A protein has these predicted regions:
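C-terminal alpha-helical interaction appendages
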Residues: 2-93
Length: 93
């Protein structure tokens, strides 16, 4: 686990891309194992949706559509952030 200061240093040194006003949804950093072994910021999809609902007053459906089109559908270079979608591990009753 890394602390906030180390995270900020890595972002600065590696010139990692961040989504504007979405810091609350950051869950970490990952390394893409391609020819560059590039580090990228990782966001939690559910937290992104909640972020837009809280900050912009969107409904759940509006925020889902916004994240799907404007975040998941965007490419902003080699350090485009990854979006983590968690697996629901709850067992049915």
């Amino acid at each position: 686990m890394i602390d906030q200061e180390t995270f900020e240093e890595i972002c600065h040194e590696e010139k990692l891309k961040l989504w504007t006003d979405c810091d609350e949804a950051i869950v970490g950093i990952a390394t893409k194992r391609d020819s560059y072994n590039q580090q990228v910021v990782v966001y939690d999809r559910d937290k992104l949706v909640k972020n837009f609902m809280n900050k912009d007053g969107m409904t759940f459906d509006e925020a889902e559509e916004w994240v799907s089109f404007n975040i998941e559908g965007a490419y902003i270079g080699e350090t485009t952030p990854l979006i983590l979608e968690r697996i629901d591990n709850e067992q049915p009753d």
